[in-house]
Amino acid sequence: MAEQLTADDWIKQGLKALARDGLTALKADPLAKAMGVSRGSFYWHFADLGAFHAALLKRWREIAAEQIIADVEADSDEPLKALLRRTFGARLDLERAVRNWAAFDAAAQTAVRAIDRRRLDYIEELLRKRGLEAATARARAQILYWTFLGFALSGPPSPAARLEGLLEEILRMVSA
């Protein structure tokens, strides 16, 4: 007998499918088939597709901001440098997929706006801790975030050696 799936199992599968195939992959039948179960299991955990989408967006906000911030704060004496390495070195398929989804869905757009605000506030906080005045920190946080978004949406990542040099230069630019 197969182990019973949890809502978390469905969310994890949904995030993988979203990152790989986009929003069109977020339907009960293909997800159930990929997990080797009936779609009844899906509806046991989620009232409808909208509830599933809301759960996916909530989880994305957790992993794409709060988890990263907690990890950076716990593991680094230089949180800005650690944040740059972590975010610019990550696979960004899910980031692109959620932003594509947000182009035509109000709930996804709200989630993207919230995560953008959270990330900007955190970057600004890190820059202020490095001694920058509030207005300068805010402006540089915005520039740094636009740089990240351009990188995230531009496709395949740079080779590791080149990326490391770019990150060092970005750090110098925003900290000067």
Residue ranges of model-derived segments:
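N-terminal intrinsically disordered/low-complexity leader segments
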Residues: 1-5
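Hydrophobic alpha-helical connector segments
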Residues: 66-97, 144
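Hydrophobic alpha-helical segments that form the core
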Residues: 93, 99, 134-172
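Short amphipathic alpha-helical elements of helix-turn-helix/winged-helix folds
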Residues: 13-17, 86, 147
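Amphipathic alpha-helical packing segments from all-alpha helical-bundle domains
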Residues: 65, 90-97, 106-142, 165
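Helix N-cap/coil-helix junction residues
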Residues: 23, 132-133, 176
